[in-house]
Amino acid sequence: MAVKRSANGSKHSAPLKRGDVLWRAVGAEVGGHIVREWYGSGPHRLILAGVMTLDGGILRIGPDGDPFDIASPSRRFAVSLHRLDWLPDLVAAGSDGARRALRLLDDWRRVFGKWNGFSWSPECLERRVFHLACAAKALAAEGSDAEIADLTLDIARQGRHLVEIGKSPERALERAVAATIAGCVLAGKPGEKLIDQGLKAFARHIDLMVLADGGHATRSPEAGVELLFDLLTLDDALGQRGRPSPESLSRAIDRLSTATRFFTLGDGHLAAFHGGEAIAPAHIAAALAHDDAGPRPLNAAPHSGYQKMVGGSLEVIADCGRPPAGSLSVSACAQPAALEIVCAKDRLITSCGWSPEAAGAHAFRLSDAASTVSVGDGSAGRPLSGFRARALGAWLVDGATQVEAKRHDDVGGVWLDIVHDGWRHVGLTHARRLFLDAVNDELRGEDSLTPIAAEPGAADGPRRYLPFAVRFHLHPEARASIARDGKSVLIRGPNNIGWWLRNDAVDVAIAPTAHFDHGLARKAGQVVLKSQVRPEVGAKIRWKLTRAEG
């Protein structure tokens, strides 16, 4: 469904009117910061009082202090500082916030106004240009003529530099969008030229990054939602400029909106795969506020590589695709056939939820950090490290190259079979068979490891065993206990509804793990179904998740 537009810039309930999306995009980011706030007072009030909290770090600068002349507590904090991630918070504070923002921008300009390897890097520049363009009107309303001239020059210079960047191709579309929005707030020929340059780059990348089913090319659901915010902002900015939006822009917005609905699970949060986090319902609602009458959510996203199973009080989403390759894989995870399961509105089964905000914790991108199979002490893929990672980025390599998914729906439920070669380095293929029984409100699963090319008589040769486990990572708000039989596991979520996980594994354990929220680790648990596998023979573990009585 196409985005609905209006010349009226006032705020009303969805669908949004033109002129509202810029503020909604900024407002959603403000909401994200408020969620991260530890002190109970709004972030803008903290900044006005001289305390900056960004990405888990705290810097006390005083009411008139200069954060750009003080060492940041961490690199993550410094990136967020130079991206101006604090700017939406100050814009939300009204006149006082805008005046403080102008002073902080002057502090930044004095030290970093000319090119700098860190501050002008793609990871800082793209969001900084976006924030400056979105906040330009509010800042100009409080600025002097000199401050407005400086702000205009900042947007023009940085916007032009943005379209010239050739690094980080996985963010090329987002850079084109930010540059075009910057052009929309600049008057005259400079603005028109930047718009034309930005739209030209946009046209090159839009259909490469937004897949036919609305998924993002990185396979991260969160990346798709954040891109949707950017495209809505771009659509609004072009309209305010009097420029028509490209058809490809409207099409991408429609597709991303459909995918956002698909990836939103029954607990209201987003599914967390491939470096994306389970963002909050309010953030999702803001992304979809432009059109509240969208199409019925799909049960499959074949281009993105995901399947969803819904029946009774159970909802399952499964990763059924190959990991992205090359630069698109800098946030990808080696977790083929991973599951997230929502039971009666409680997200019980998830993954560790790694995202780039977790900084260097790349071990959580490996197979044993998700609800899937692990073999030995290896992984179905790995991120680059050392010199290659410094040169190229933390690309994911040696991942699954062949992944097949077959689905069958009938009156009684849904069958889903996933087969992949992610464990080919140990000579095994993993097959995960799932059946969601809508009648009995249960999910049955079978995880099999089979030899890729078993030679005749191999089973009679020397016996070599590898540890084999099926892991179910629990949400931090879920708890689990093992029954007296030593096998069955009772899992309960916030609603206190119990679910039995029964299985035929050799051994069962509940082990500690971590779950990341905005890059910060929370304590969580995982249920580990253990067995052993002979690569020449194979092995399987069967399990069933069913609602507990009473």
Question: What feature does the model see in each segment?
Answer:
Residues 315-401:
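Catalytic core of carbohydrate-active enzymes
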Residues 1-62:
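Extreme N-terminal leader/anchor segments
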Residues 69, 126, 362-550:
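CBM-like, beta-strand-rich accessory domains located in the C-terminal region of large
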Residues 54-78, 91-93:
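Asp/Glu-centered strand-loop micro-motifs enriched in Gly/Pro and often flanked by an aromatic residue
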Residues 74-253:
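Aromatic-lined, polymer-binding surfaces characteristic
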Residues 211-354, 524, 534:
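Carbohydrate-active enzyme catalytic cores, enriched for enzymes
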Residues 82, 305, 337, 369, ...:
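Residues that flank catalytic or metal-binding motifs in active/ligand-binding sites
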